[in-house]
Swiss-Prot record:
PTM statement from Swiss-Prot or TrEMBL: Extensively O-glycosylated.
Keywords for this protein: Cell wall, Glycoprotein, GPI-anchor, Lipoprotein, Membrane, Secreted, Signal
Lipidation (GPI-anchor amidated asparagine): 217
Record site feature (Covalent attachment to cell wall glycan), residues: 204
Positions of the pro-segment in this chain: 218-239
Protein localization: Secreted, Cell wall; Membrane
Name of the featured protein: Cell wall protein CWP1
Main location: secreted
Highest rank taxon of the organism: Eukaryota
Biased composition annotated in UniProt, kind: Low complexity: 142-196
Provenance organism: Saccharomyces cerevisiae (strain ATCC 204508 / S288c)
Protein family per UniProt: Belongs to the SRP1/TIP1 family.
Amino acid sequence: MKFSTALSVALFALAKMVIADSEEFGLVSIRSGSDLQYLSVYSDNGTLKLGSGSGSFEATITDDGKLKFDDDKYAVVNEDGSFKEGSESDAATGFSIKDGHLNYKSSSGFYAIKDGSSYIFSSKQSDDATGVAIRPTSKSGSVAADFSPSDSSSSSSASASSASASSSTKHSSSIESVETSTTVETSSASSPTASVISQITDGQIQAPNTVYEQTENAGAKAAVGMGAGALAVAAAYLL
């Protein structure tokens, strides 16, 4: 069992190491036929906005579903649904990339709220909000690959659990095999010696002088056999 537990812990640690963040990507808004098409996400005194100004972000999605920017800050959701920059401890979780779009809480719908010459970036709809999609664009200009941290974690955990269960099963099987072998050997060693009565060629019955019986404490005791004369009489009677 100690071996099985150690192996399980090692596999779980390895699985955590294998899980990685997404590739780095830019955040580009998509709203065909409007001035919201191809705007970038940037920070205005900590508030995340959509605009065409400089200072746009590159971002990654961490292995626990947080949106991390290239200034080492994270996307945080305010009570009204708008996004701001903040620390990892306050970061929102639930980000992923699916079908070429940034998702939050399994939804690809985001909203832009007019604020002067730019737009406040939000996760909630309001009367003055316009729906947009966010395309994660890699440094090469292509759409970033799909990334789902929850699926990656589940798969790795399941692999580790499966390997741990397999190891535990093998260990138990080995113990059972040893126990079975020991039981068989013990039974063979404690089996009583059976006395066989045989018939000789002239038709008389011949029995050994000593019969061994198994006692309750697995010891053998000898019982004195019948005398030769009594045996002959019994044989004649039977014939």
